């Protein structure tokens, strides 16, 4: 009876009183409810305006437990539909999700599911009653972890979009709600808690946000829930201050009607400034009395123990854990306490099973460390090793060796004895056969056994025979008959007059009155020693068109180049000079080569920093280069004609296409060098649609357009494209690439300017070897159509092909280097040539359309200068008996380095006189030796190629 009275009292109280702050709203709602018989939804008359452009993430959590009957469940759905009427629903305004819960949580739709209000209304009306338990805490946890995740459509916290939960429940939860609700509120979620009927009001307050009078509501039954519609319209449509003001909250900003409050994350407390947060350390603040460890938990603390200890009943002290004392350890043999746990051990002769509890007798052979090579046999307390048939056990009692019947029986095999499983047999080497006695061997004579058909020689091989020809003959295609070798016809003999076949090669011959020079190809008149009064004291030696005097052994030539004196001290003793020994009367001094200086011991040499030790005269950058130096210019500049000053490349227009060899002979490492070479050329140009336009082709067995003339308007983007260029690494179809360049690259469709604009057109073709197709046709067409062709060859590039590609004059358009180490020098020369062409094109008004104007007149290129050193002038005790060919500019640079550029304005003739100085002759000899070394290396390469060609011809 008392329970019935209490129930009636609570029902009446719930019908009369909600919360003080909402009394007027509920009173207004009740008056509306009394008029419900006149209209289906009279509360909609209160919706004077919707929450237009209001941004919010709203999730309804609906109690769908068995205590809610079908009629009440329908009332809840009507209430939700009424709330939806004043919301501005859409992806950029209010997003709506809905969960209903009983014993489990069902996600009806998430925040990202629907984009229109009509879709949400249909989904609400289709909901089915779960009719199970009341797991309110589980539903709030689901909303916190999943419903408000960005994956489900919630907007990031940094956007300050309000997150709102509206939860409707009619009974006491079957799980804990206070802790999970507090956690949700701490993350910034605003919770409205609506209780219907006999709901514990304290439970509602533990769910809803503060102040409770604005966020916690209690109605008597589900028929009265719709009276709250206008209340929520006012609360949901109020401006969210967190998104409109600079709130300065350190962790979370929580919207409250007309204002906001700051909240901290779990484990933090709000400072007195009501915006910043600090960690809440209750272990430090209170006398916790924990014996070992104190651990902070949200709003409190707990005591914990170290590993191997357990917390006593008082929750403060710690006692050691005896894990083995418990009867459920399960160890079959022995239990041993360990740190924080226990472990099982087995008696001797047993091993612990994988379950770590039971034991099994040890199978010694089953363990992987018994060491038996063939077979392991268990014994009572150990094991023993056995060998397979045909093997015997070694002294280590584990490994086995094969029984060597050949060694035991001494069978007398002439070549090889082969062991079998239980015996042996004799075997002969390849090309031999076993005699009937089964022991000795005889060579197989294939030439005698069959009609070999060789015209000249038959040669036995291991398995057969081959025909060979006598010296001076080549084997024919039938591999049997022979033809005499015409060496003069097979090779580019290079003889000046006539070529004569020899037994193994050819020889050049000269007409009467001439003799063959040392190159073995060109001819010279009879030696000067026989024709004139040479005046040599000891002996005269002809040297091509001249002669040199030589001295007998033990003597050296004097400075006059004719008379002799005894050998110098440098040759007579072990002088110890690292570089050069120079005679000085009856003694000697040590000197160093150019680029080095003498060490303190007077014998060893140390390398100079040429750029620091000389007045190099470089306007921008000096770079050490072996025993000398070279000048370089900063980006956007090119080296002037004097090799020292720098000048800015003109900004004139040009259409330039690179044709780059990407064949496998180049290699990936050298391909990177070529990319740097291209980047250096680009740096010297002004890249823009009105100035320089640049395209790039890479070719191998196919041609790939890396970028066209129209692709890039800046050097930065262009260089980035060059850096990302992938190496093709196949064949070398240079002719195909030239065809592609001629037919496509200079078309207006790919960015070339019309011929009528008279913009110069140029192509830089880079290759490192012989092309697999013809290059002349398309190179000729390109040049005939006004495209200036620059040819750059490295390594095995063929000079004839480079000449076919390059425009005239070739000394300005053809560049060759033996390896990639000199690519910088080629780059500087090429940039200089292109810049000169641009300067020239700027100054010419009537040049033919599409033709790159010829460069302005420059100082004539250095001609090869032949220097015959017949006497030593002022250089004592030094003799040069060879003739070398060098370019004049190399010699000039050498003397300029030696003189430290003290006379930069001097004429070349004045500088030539300095070549006769002793140190310059030493430099000259060093340069000559280097050139001879390079020529020798190239000669060796040509010899190897000739030998390969002869081998192919021999077996063709």
UniProtKB/Swiss-Prot annotation:
**Superkingdom of this protein's organism:** Eukaryota
Q: What is its main location?
A: secreted
Summarize the protein's role.
Answer: Involved in matrix assembly.
Q: What's the protein here called?
A: Matrilin-2
- Where is the segment annotated Disordered? 840-863
The record's subcellular location field reads: Secreted
- Locate the transmembrane regions by residue number: none
**Single GO BP term:** glial cell migration
Which Gene Ontology terms of cellular component type are present?
A: basement membrane; collagen-containing extracellular matrix; extracellular matrix; extracellular region; matrilin complex
Signal peptide per UniProt: 1-23
Which source organism does the UniProt entry give? Homo sapiens (Human)
């Amino acid at each position: 009876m008392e329970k019935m009275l209490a129930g009636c009292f609570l029902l009446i109280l719930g019908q009369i009183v909600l919360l003080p702050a909402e009394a007027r709203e509920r009173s207004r709602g009740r008056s509306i409810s009394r008029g419900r018989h006149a209209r289906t939804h009279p509360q909609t008359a209160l919706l004077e305006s919707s929450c237009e452009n209001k941004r919010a993430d709203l999730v309804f959590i609906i109690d769908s437990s068995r205590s809610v009957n079908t009629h009440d469940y329908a009332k809840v759905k009507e209430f939700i539909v009424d709330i939806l009427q004043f919301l501005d629903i859409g992806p950029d305004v209010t997003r709506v999700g809905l969960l209903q819960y009983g014993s489990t949580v069902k996600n009806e739709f998430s925040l990202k599911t629907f984009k229109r209000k009509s879709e949400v209304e249909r989904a609400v009306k289709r909901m089915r009653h779960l009719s199970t338990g009341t797991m309110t805490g589980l539903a709030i946890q689901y909303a916190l972890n999943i419903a408000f995740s960005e994956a489900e459509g919630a907007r990031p916290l940094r956007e300050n979009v309000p997150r709102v939960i509206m939860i409707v429940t009619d009974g006491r939860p079957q799980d804990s709600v206070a802790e999970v609700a507090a956690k949700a509120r701490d993350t910034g979620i605003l919770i409205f808690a609506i209780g219907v009927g006999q709901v514990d009001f304290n439970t509602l307050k533990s769910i809803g946000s503060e102040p409770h009078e604005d966020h916690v509501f209690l109605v008597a039954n589900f028929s009265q829930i719709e009276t709250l519609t206008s209340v929520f319209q006012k609360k949901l449509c109020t401006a969210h201050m967190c998104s409109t003001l600079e709130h300065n909250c350190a962790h979370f900003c929580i919207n409250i009607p007309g204002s906001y409050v700051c909240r901290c994350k779990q484990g933090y407390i709000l400072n007195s400034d009501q915006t910043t947060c600090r960690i809440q350390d209750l272990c430090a603040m209170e006398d916790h009395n924990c014996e070992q460890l104190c651990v902070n938990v949200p709003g409190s603390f707990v005591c914990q123990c170290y590993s191997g200890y357990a917390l006593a009943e008082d929750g403060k002290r710690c006692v050691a854990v005896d894990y083995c004392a418990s009867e459920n350890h399960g160890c079959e043999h022995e239990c041993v306490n360990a740190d924080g746990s226990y472990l099982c051990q087995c008696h001797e002769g047993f091993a612990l099973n994988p379950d770590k509890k039971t034991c099994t007798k040890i199978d010694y052979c089953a363990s992987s460390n018994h060491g038996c090579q063939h077979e392991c046999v268990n014994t009572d307390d150990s094991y023993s090793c056995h060998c397979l048939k045909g093997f015997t056990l070694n002294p280590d009692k584990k490994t086995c060796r094969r029984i060597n019947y050949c060694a035991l029986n001494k069978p007398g095999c002439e070549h090889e004895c082969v062991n079998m499983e239980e015996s042996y047999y004799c075997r002969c080497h390849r090309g031999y056969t076993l005699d009937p006695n089964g022991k000795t061997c005889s060579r197989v004579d294939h030439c005698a056994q069959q009609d070999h058909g060789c015209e000249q020689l038959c040669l036995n091989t291991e398995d057969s025979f081959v025909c060979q020809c006598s010296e001076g003959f080549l084997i024919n295609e039938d591999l049997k008959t022979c033809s005499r070798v015409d060496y003069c016809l097979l090779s580019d003999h290079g003889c000046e007059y006539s070529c004569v076949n020899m037994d193994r090669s050819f020889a050049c011959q000269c007409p009467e009155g001439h003799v063959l020079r040392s190159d073995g190809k060109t001819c010279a008149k009879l030696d000067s020693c026989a024709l004139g009064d040479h005046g040599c004291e000891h002996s005269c030696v002809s040297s091509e068109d001249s002669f040199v005097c030589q001295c007998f052994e033990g003597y050296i030539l004097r400075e006059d180049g004719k008379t002799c004196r005894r050998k110098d001290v440098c040759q007579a003793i072990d002088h110890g000079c690292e570089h050069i020994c120079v005679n000085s009367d009856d003694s000697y001094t040590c000197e160093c080569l150019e680029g080095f200086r003498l060490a303190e011991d007077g014998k060893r040499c140390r390398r100079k920093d040429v750029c620091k030790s000389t007045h190099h005269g470089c306007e921008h950058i000096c770079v050490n280069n072996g025993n000398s130096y070279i000048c370089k210019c900063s980006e956007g500049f090119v080296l002037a004609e004097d090799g020292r000053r720098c000048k800015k490349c003109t900004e004139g227009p040009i259409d330039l296409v690179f044709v780059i060899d990407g064949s496998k002979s180049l290699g990936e490492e050298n391909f990177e060098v070529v990319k740097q070479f291209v980047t250096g050329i680009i740096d010297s140009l002004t890249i823009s649609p009105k100035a320089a336009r640049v395209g790039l082709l890479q070719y191998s067995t196919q041609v790939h357009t890396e970028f066209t003339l129209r692709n890039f308007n800046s050097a930065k983007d262009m260089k980035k494209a060059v850096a990302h260029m992938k190496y093709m690494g196949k064949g070398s179809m240079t002719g195909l690439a030239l065809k592609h360049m001629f037919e496509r690259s200079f078309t207006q469709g790919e960015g070339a300017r019309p011929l009528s604009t008279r913009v110069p057109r140029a192509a830089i073709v880079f290759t490192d070897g012989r092309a697999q197709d013809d290059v002349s046709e398309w190179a000729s067409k390109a040049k005939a159509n006004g495209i200036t062709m620059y040819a750059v060859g490295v390594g095995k590039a063929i000079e004839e092909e480079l000449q076919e590609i390059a425009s005239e004059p070739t000394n300005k358009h053809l560049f060759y280097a033996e390896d990639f180490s000199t690519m910088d020098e080629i780059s500087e020369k090429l940039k200089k040539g292109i810049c000169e062409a641009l300067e020239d094109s700027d100054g010419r008004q009537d040049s033919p359309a599409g033709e790159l104007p010829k460069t302005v007149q420059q100082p004539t290129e250095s001609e090869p200068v032949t220097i015959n050193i017949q006497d030593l002038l002022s250089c004592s005790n030094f003799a040069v008996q060879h003739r070398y060919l060098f370019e004049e500019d190399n010699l000039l640079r050498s003397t300029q380095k030696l003189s430290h550029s003290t006379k930069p304005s001097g004429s070349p003739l004045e500088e030539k006189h300095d070549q006769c100085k002793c140190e310059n002759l030493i430099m000259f000899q060093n340069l000559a030796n280097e050139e001879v070394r390079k020529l020798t290396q190239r000669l060796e390469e040509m010899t190897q190629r000739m030998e390969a060609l002869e081998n192919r011809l021999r077996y063709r």
